[in-house]
């Protein structure tokens, strides 16, 4: 993952992915980006690869390709990798592999409709426009609770809570429960609280999310 999502929104250091690309190219290793989370606007671009200006050899994507409405995944590959599968004898099957629901017409229709909505409603641009406000609000929480780190990029961010002496994850569970009771949903992994608002979010909705999270943190 160019930005590790489920692990806690781990943003790579400046130059890390570029150096990884150089090493993979030098040693003939395929660079594969898992963009199931970061793809389709989460970072304000089609893919994180564009945000970081790094061209991988393959991209795995899903979720945002249909906005999660219908299950669908895809793999984007470099042209010469594609050609390696297509240059076999005409009578041969280049890749004897497939899934029962590959190319499912309903999933494909949902994907095409989703891509149209992204473009027509300017949702990637909306994510870019909201990013500074998202960043300001999440870092404004630094004195609201015992935090050890705050990370963000695009419309995703995370707060690392100082572990409760009584046991790991207890503080995060408390924040999750209080946020839920107040009508908000946050992701909890260990002592990390993650936030990934939808691309259609408006500034006032972003404020409501952070106001609710601030109240949940106040209960620690």
In which residue ranges do the predicted regions lie?
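Conserved N-terminal phosphate-binding loop of PLP-dependent enzymes in the Aspartate aminotransferase
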Residues: 1-220
């Amino acid at each position: 993952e160019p930005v590790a999502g489920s692990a806690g929104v781990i943003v790579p250091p400046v130059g890390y992915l570029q150096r990884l690309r150089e090493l993979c190219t030098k040693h003939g290793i395929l660079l594969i980006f898992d963009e199931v989370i970061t793809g389709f606007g989460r970072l304000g671009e089609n893919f994180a690869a564009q945000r970081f200006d790094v061209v991988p050899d393959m991209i795995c994507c899903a979720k945002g390709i249909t906005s999660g409405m219908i299950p669908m995944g895809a793999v984007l590959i470099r042209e010469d990798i594609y050609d390696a599968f297509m240059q076999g004898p005409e009578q041969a099957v280049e890749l004897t592999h497939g899934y029962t629901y590959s190319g499912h017409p309903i999933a494909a229709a949902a994907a095409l409709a989703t891509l149209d909505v992204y473009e027509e409603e300017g949702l990637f641009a909306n994510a870019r426009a909201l990013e500074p406000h998202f960043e300001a609000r999440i870092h404004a929480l630094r004195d609201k609770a015992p935090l050890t780190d705050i990370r963000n990029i695009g419309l995703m961010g995370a707060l690392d809570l100082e572990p409760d002496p009584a046991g790991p994850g207890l503080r995060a569970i408390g924040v999750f429960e209080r946020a839920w009771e107040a009508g908000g949903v946050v992701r909890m992994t260990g002592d990390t609280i993650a936030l990934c608002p939808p691309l259609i979010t408006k500034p006032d909705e972003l404020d409501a999310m952070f106001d609710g999270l601030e109240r949940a943190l106040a209960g620690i």
